[in-house]
């Protein structure tokens, strides 16, 4: 079983405190399911980015399976890995969609638990899903250490084909923060350029702007894999629901991390 790695750090360890914090994240937001295929959510501590993430989860539809693409911050494990372990959070147990996972056999995606063991980017999304949908769903966690354009397009296409054949209702979630440790005005300027490419569903444009701006968006690969898969399944538009940065909470606008909530329909 994949035990929580960052409970008590990124979000509360005790279930009652975690539910209280999640409730605060959703405060004032209308819970209204939209026909969403994909989304971008931040993965910082809930005190910093939980409110931004809640903008996505408030409108996320109920699905059989949520495919979660996250960057590999730790460097452990395979370059592209899927976990087939059961995942545990303070709110309970989540099963992996082993049928979809088995479809990845022999592909660029390795079954590998090591890459997931200490990685926070996917884990921090799970209590949001549990808060909204209880335990009535499965996940497919994909951790991307390799984030080059060719790899993520291959992964996104592969997942989309599997989902299409399965007939299941699936939503894709890309876990990513945006610019790291720049003054707020510069971070927003860089992030606006990357977000514009995302809203245009333009994967090559994301990479072009990323290199040109030397941007420190940590989950550009997961975002691009999510966009690739969503487009394969018919997505035609994207929308920015919310943008913020860590300075809004800490008060330090000289070195912020950017957070965006984006949906793809």
UniProtKB/Swiss-Prot annotation:
<dbReference type="Pfam" id="PF01875">
    <property type="entry name" value="Memo"/>
</dbReference>
<protein>
    <recommendedName>
        <fullName>MEMO1 family protein Mbar_A1422</fullName>
    </recommendedName>
</protein>
<dbReference type="InterPro" id="IPR002737">
    <property type="entry name" value="MEMO1_fam"/>
</dbReference>
<comment type="similarity">
    <text>Belongs to the MEMO1 family.</text>
</comment>
